[in-house]
Design a protein with these regions (language model features):
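P-loop NTPase switch/coupling surface
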Residues: 1-172
Length: 173
C-alpha cells in the first residue's frame, strides 16, 4: 500500500469519527490507581486506532486488559488476579480506573468507574477477591460529579499473539 493511500485511509477514518460513525466510543481512560501504571495516567483516544509501544513492563498489556474489562459484561479479572505466589498489594487504596464514552456523536460523555473489590460469598455466589464492579464517581480521581452510569455496551475481541503464535513459529519463521 503506498503512502498516498495510507494518508487517504487515515483521513477517511478521521472523518468517520468526526461524523459520529463509531457509536459507544471510548474517548479516554484514566488510571487513578492501577497495577504498575503511574497514578492518573490517562490515554485519550482521539483517533479510532491506537498503537501502544514501549519497553517490557511498561503497562501495555495492563492497559489492554483494562480496556477489555471496560464494557458491560467484561472484567479485567480474567487477566489480573491475586494468588498466593503473586498477591495483589493494594497499598491501602483500591485498584481502579475510569473511562469516558459517548453513545453517539451528540451525547454527553458518560464516565464509568471500575473498582476491584472483595466480594463476600453468598448462597448463590462464591467469594471472589478479584471482583470488579462499577462504583460511584470519585471527585478525588478527577471525575465529573454526575451520576453513576452503566458501562459501555460493546462486543470485545481480544487478541494476544503471545498466546496465538508458538515459540517455534516465533523463532523459525
Amino acid at each position: 500500500m503506498d503512502s498516498i493511500k495510507v494518508q487517504q485511509n487515515i483521513k477517511t477514518i478521521g472523518q468517520m469519527k468526526a461524523n459520529g460513525v463509531f457509536e459507544n466510543y471510548i474517548e479516554y481512560i484514566d488510571f487513578p490507581f492501577y497495577k504498575n501504571l503511574i497514578p492518573h495516567s490517562k490515554i485519550t483516544f482521539e483517533f479510532p486506532l491506537t498503537v501502544l509501544v514501549g519497553k517490557n513492563g511498561g503497562g501495555k498489556s495492563s492497559t489492554l486488559h483494562a480496556l477489555f474489562g471496560a464494557p458491560k459484561g467484561y472484567t479485567c479479572s480474567d487477566f489480573w488476579f491475586s494468588t498466593d505466589v503473586d498477591p495483589i498489594a493494594d497499598g491501602g487504596d483500591r485498584p481502579r480506573y475510569f473511562y469516558g464514552y459517548k453513545t453517539d456523536k451528540n451525547s454527553e460523555i458518560k464516565e464509568v468507574m471500575k473498582t476491584r473489590i472483595r466480594r463476600g460469598g453468598t448462597k448463590t455466589k462464591k467469594e471472589d477477591p478479584d471482583y470488579w464492579e462499577t462504583s460511584r464517581p470519585l471527585k478525588k480521581d478527577g471525575m465529573a460529579e454526575k451520576r453513576r452510569y452503566t458501562p459501555v455496551e460493546k462486543d470485545v475481541v481480544y487478541l494476544d499473539f503471545r498466546a496465538e503464535v508458538s515459540a517455534f513459529d516465533k523463532i523459525l519463521h
